[in-house]
Amino acid sequence: SSSSAASDVYKRQTTIGPVAIAYNLGDTEINLSTETLGKIFKGEIKKWNDEAIAADNEGTDLPDKDITVIFRSDESGTSANFQKFLKAATGDWDSEGKQFPDTVGEGANGSSGVADQVANIDGAITYVESGFADQKEGDGVKKAKIDFGHGPVELSTESVNKALENLEFKETDSEHNMVVDSEALFSSDNEGAYPLILTTYNIVCSKGYDEETSKLVKSFFTTVLDHQDDQLAEQGFIPVEGAHLDKLKAAVDALQ
């Protein structure tokens, strides 16, 4: 837009995509602490009945079965965010970027690829956008409950929005330029919150529109926020609600 040359550019979230820890272990329901999760993906925990997993799942009969880690073989924003999460949440993860290290487990291409692999391999585990895990539920794929510090949390609309309640943003020139502080998000441990999420952004000029264009831009973003429908949910995205939705609407109102 020509107006952006004379105005600040705002980033704001439109959809929130939670990342599931998806696994294939028959009917066994699994809880994993962030520390245990990091050790699994580093290859330090190799069996499902490892004492660390047993400590996270008291009273559960865990199988003496090999863990097969499945990772994204292609470059991916999900891999970049998951590695940021492991570093922030555990303090013990050295790799970063869109390429996941290929030192442990097996690679698969794309979100559907890793979900397929987990469905096909008994004992497999991966990180994947929630919707792809849901699509494989009928093939034995389950989502682990993650203990971020206050007990195991199930991935749900409620737990993701709980994480969004205390979302921190990076220091910018405007409160309406909403760039998420992912390090603060991933290391947060609010009770009942699921902070392992991907945020996607729209980029928009903050001002400089003529009256008609301003109305169109505001109308577009208002419609996006007001119609977070079942179709989004089917693709694994979570509708934004509550206080965070109010902040996003205020940012739309501030456009000039």
What are these regions (language model features)?
Residues 1-6, 10:
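Single conserved hydrophobic/aromatic residue that forms the stacking wall/gate
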Residues 8, 23-28, 66-72, 101-105, ...:
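Second-shell loop/turn segments in exported
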Residues 23-26, 39-50, 74-75, 83-91, ...:
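Sec-exported extracytoplasmic/periplasmic mature domains
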Residues 75-170:
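Ligand-binding pocket segment of bilobal, Venus flytrap-like solute-binding proteins
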